[in-house]
Amino acid sequence: MASLIEKLLRTGDKKTLKTLRNYADSINALEDTFKSFTDAEIREETDRLRSRHQDGETLEALLPEAFAAVREASSRTLGMRHFDVQLMGGAALHLGNIAEMKTGEGKTLVATAPAYLNALSGKGVHVVTVNDYLAEYQSELMGRVYRFLGLTSGCILSNQDPTVRREQYAADITYGTNNEFGFDYLRDNMAWDAGELVQRGHNFAIVDEVDSILIDEARTPLIISGPAQGDTNRWYSEFSKVVLRLQPDVDYEVDEKKRTVGVLEAGIEKVEDYLGIQNLYESANTPLIGFLNNAIKAKELFKRDKDYVILDGEVLIVDEHTGRILAGRRYNEGMHQAIEAKENVEIKAENQTLATVTLQNYFRMYSKLAGMTGTAETEAAEFMSTYKLGVVPIPTNRDMQRIDQSDLVYKNEVVKFDAVVQDIAERHKNGQPVLVGTTSVEKSEYLSKLLAKEGIRHEVLNAKNHAREASIVAQAGRKGAVTVATNMAGRGTDIMLGGNAEFTAIAELSKRGLDPEENSDEYEAAWPAALAAAKQAVKDEHEEVLDLGGLYVLGTERHESRRIDNQLRGRSGRQGDPGESRFYLSLTDDLMRLFNSGAAERLMNSSVPDDVALESKLVSRAIASAQGQVEGRNAEQRKNVLKYDDVLNRQREAIYGDRRRILEGDDLHEKVQYFLEDTINSLIDAATAEGSGDDWDYNQLWANLRTLYPATVTAQEIIDEAGGKSRVTAEFLREEILSDARLVYQAREEAIGSESMRELERRVVLSVIGRKWQEHLYEMDYLKEGIGLRAMAQRDPLVEYQREGFVMFQSMMEAIREESIGFLYNLEVEVTPAEDVVVADGSAAGAHTEHHDPQIRAAGLEAPEKPAQLQYTAPGEDGGTQTRIEGRASGRSGNPAKAASQEPRKQAKKKRR
């Protein structure tokens, strides 16, 4: 079915390529004209194009001239002229597609033309890369082209403060990583003041390595979390004791491959008996399911001295690849606390989700999205279904010359690596450059020791120091170079045979103390000569390496994904260069062991000697089958993550939209009046639901009203007005109470002033929304954690999650309305009235008048207290999850709803009852 869908998706390829070629022809027709322009005239072209767009011309109509301007600017500033296929790739990006371009086709340069064209709208363009180093490098290098054309470029890096970030986003074109863009979006939606916002919208994004970012990393959502309120430690301790009474395969099941557990009926009964509850499936008990699952995982899936160690009474995570202790890292979603309870050490504060979004839903916010990669074909159907992105294969500038050899398979890892070292030694002796790909840091270091024993000089890259690695990878095509790298190391940097002239030139100018931003004019003046010298230096060596067969890529293991294998192969044979690739495998490799153990076992039992390589269709089929299983599992995980986040996303859009409008100064008076009517209507509906005026409990109704606002009308006055209890109707009661509430509100507004009241409305509603949304996220986390068990009760977990999530959202919105009204009536405030102040400014006029908004002070109306520590969880480059902990200075006590705050789980239980 997938292949059929892929064929259907590609039926329009010929038509699309024809359109792209027509664009390239139009751009080529303008080349001589733009070559004749002076630098100043090319710069003026930007102003002309921008004006034409403002006057109504579409960006598509401006594309040929804009692309021609960028091509000429790039030739003059970088000495790099766009090939026709690069212009075609750029046009594909502008049209909102994924441009599938092989490694070495210059994707970094491809992005400049569509980025420039779309920046003419003034709405900003985001170029998304896989790490900070590439973001900074590409921003600096391509920023020279943009600056030449009169545009600005910025770069978002992980440790920048908000002021710097705001400046970078204000640039015409901003580079950064997917994680940083996503976290800024979340932080903006936790902001208390408009001055804290850094992003300015989501207009157009170009995603480099789009398959890695939008596919591989999409299984892990972005999460900002902080210490949870309340004491949940008792439950962790309680459940660590409960699971000791449960037995695997009798009370619960464990799947080590998927790292999941499932509680069986017998186990559920034992837990219910132990806790003294009727039904673990009831909504009120949903939080308990998360504690139970984590306790079983801690018992069965997390092993002491393998996954973690205990040092000084603390649980410390061990990196599965390196064996190193990861100081400061903690497992998410209560897992760390469950392990602490299991080991009977101090249980530290649980983290609560403060804001979260999946990469899928973040990138779907952009008005237009595009991407580049060398390997998108295998995921074309998913790109279309999730992101509405078509994949357009762009022809190579020169025909591919690389030879991909068949795999060599050995019975075990030891003999496999012996054969790998022997192959490397032979090629190194001849001077052929070799790039060796491994699947983990541990394997890289193991191979490095074997190479050192043989006296083979080499570099080892483990995706830790991106700047150093990029410079080494760039020179990995030099004669005699041997580079061992994890599959992710040095991404985004081309390996050029004989060395990389561009990197050599940059290094030379850096030695001279020149910087492209600080010494812009000097740098531009020195660049052509430095680049020419570097090109000459690598030219002779390039010819030598060509004669040796080009770059040899050796894979020591098949990756879970065919795309990653293809990415590794694609390092060789760039721009029509010769090259060769081969994978060495063993039957004990993780992929074969976990996902095709039957085939591996049959081959292991064959009579072939251990040190003889196996080559058979059975091996090829086994590998393809194993990769298919993993890709299918990962695709299912992504689909599942998205299905559940889509439920939350609709709620998030509503809440974040409200917050943004409040921060931008919306007048909330009408909304507050709606809050008032809705809240009073709810109270009256509840009080008059049964019986008639004679039966209603007026004392209880007025007790409830007084918690909301200081009512001046009494129940007796309304009864007398109606002519007795029997003549009181719900509608009459409603009109009288609403009339009284509006009069009291009007009196409060007159007392503090209309302008002050509008500001108070904004501050209170923003504060209550912030607290209630965090509590809601907490409840939704626990709902999702336990929802899987509903399947045992013959109910669809997703449907249940949608239904209960909607009910919880409605309850939250009701609570926001009620609490906001309560604080607006009852909060004691101090007001400094608005005033116009005359300020001397030294101008000819001598002074000007500034309007100062009213200042409102009240207990709890300060900016909400920021957690002493925030934890950022995001996809890691290695395919796993990375966590960063950021300390924050504690602020003043928080929002006006603080006094009414209760532990979120208690509230969740109340609402569900």
Swiss-Prot record:
Subcellular location: Cell membrane; Cytoplasm
Record's bilayer topology term: Peripheral membrane protein
GO terms under biological process: intracellular protein transmembrane transport; protein import; protein targeting; protein transport by the Sec complex
Any GO MF annotation of the entry: ATP binding
EC assignment: 7.4.2.8
Pfam hit, one: SecA_SW
Region (Disordered): 865-913
First-level EC class: translocase
Transmembrane regions: none
Keywords from the named record: ATP-binding, Cell membrane, Cytoplasm, Membrane, Nucleotide-binding, Protein transport, Translocase, Translocation, Transport
Entry's Gene Ontology cellular component terms: cell envelope Sec protein transport complex; cytosol; plasma membrane
Record-listed ATP binding positions: Q86, G104, E105, G106, K107, T108, D494
SMART domains the UniProt entry points to: SecA_DEAD (SM00957), SecA_PP_bind (SM00958)
Catalysis performed (reactions): ATP + H2O + cellular proteinSide 1 = ADP + phosphate + cellular proteinSide 2
Function: Part of the Sec protein translocase complex. Interacts with the SecYEG preprotein conducting channel. Has a central role in coupling the hydrolysis of ATP to the transfer of proteins into and across the cell membrane, serving as an ATP-driven molecular motor driving the stepwise translocation of polypeptide chains across the membrane.
Family per record: Belongs to the SecA family.
NCBIfam families hit by this protein: PRK12904.1, secA
Oligomer status and interactors: Monomer and homodimer. Part of the essential Sec protein translocation apparatus which comprises SecA, SecYEG and auxiliary proteins SecDF. Other proteins may also be involved.
The protein's name: Protein translocase subunit SecA
Organism field: Paenarthrobacter aurescens (strain TC1)
Lineage, opening ranks: Bacteria, Bacillati, Actinomycetota, Actinomycetes, Micrococcales
